[in-house]
Amino acid sequence: MIGNLDNDSMIADLGCGCGSQPIQLALHCQAKVKALALFPLFIDKLMDRCLKSGVADKVEGIVGDMCSLPFDKESLDVIWSEGAIYNIGFKRGITEWREYLKSGGFLVVSESSWLTDTRPEEIEQFWNEAYPEIDTIANKVQQLSDAGYQDIRTFVLSSECWIENFYLPQKDAQRLFLERYPDNKTAAELVAIQRHEAKLYSRYSDYYGYVFYVARLS
């Protein structure tokens, strides 16, 4: 989907956390990667993983805010944001970030989206409260087009991907979290919310999911 990247190309991964996506980008693309996260601890962990993976020379960890990017205008060949654009909002992100892309540069983001035009009231109410910007794929594509992007492509992540990479690892994290904060009401409420969300996904995964949007700036 994205071609013509070379050793001088630059990819910015916004909201990278300490995850694996900057490493995978560095391994599979010739371009260099600027990985941005809000917390220094995330960047420290990421760069340690990059060193162990042999890509520390291709990845630059940056502590920064996706609401105020520390990049020059029209300096990036690709903006990548996996499961993070919701922090700023889809419409705001695709609009504000475009000025950092070179002409013909690519935007690649994943976003929670409705997979159907209608859905049960329980899951619609949950998501409209949790993330009011959730919308159908068709409407998200239209928003990208209205913001000046073209050649828009989409693909839906499988439910197995969401379960195996998010909800299952979350179970171990929840257990450790509750062991660390026993008899803590706030901790218990947080875990209860997460477990409720997981149950909703197991019940309603046909109606929503994570969708990748790949678009080229006009």
Residue spans for each PLM region:
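A short SAM/SAH-binding and catalytic strip from SAM-dependent methyltransferases
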Residues: 78-91
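A short glycine-rich, Lys/Arg-flanked "PGG" loop and its adjoining helix->strand segment in the class I
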Residues: 92-106
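Short alpha-helix
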Residues: 133-148
